Design a protein with these regions (language model features):
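Catalytic-core regions of hydrolytic enzymes
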Residues: 2-74
Length: 74
């Protein structure tokens, strides 16, 4: 089994601003933390993005469909 983590937002899609941080940065930081935590426990996980890039909804769905198997969690 693999866990697919989708931080959403990114690139030109900043999301809400909370204090001095944008939602896209908070989501990426949280997703990286989750991914590292899972991997440190030998739980297979992968991110749909690990840099500040923008994905369309179609690109995101295509990438998830390419990565996932029948028993994966998204």
């Amino acid at each position: 089994m693999k866990i697919i983590i989708d931080p959403y937002r990114g690139g030109d899609d900043y999301g809400a601003k909370i204090g001095d941080k944008y939602e896209k940065d908070i989501l990426l930081d949280l997703s990286n933390y989750m991914n590292n935590s899972f991997n440190n426990q030998n739980i297979n996980s992968i991110l749909t993005r690990n840099t500040d890039e923008s994905l369309t909804d179609e690109d995101r769905v295509n990438q998830i469909n390419k990565l996932k198997q029948d028993n994966d969690l998204i």
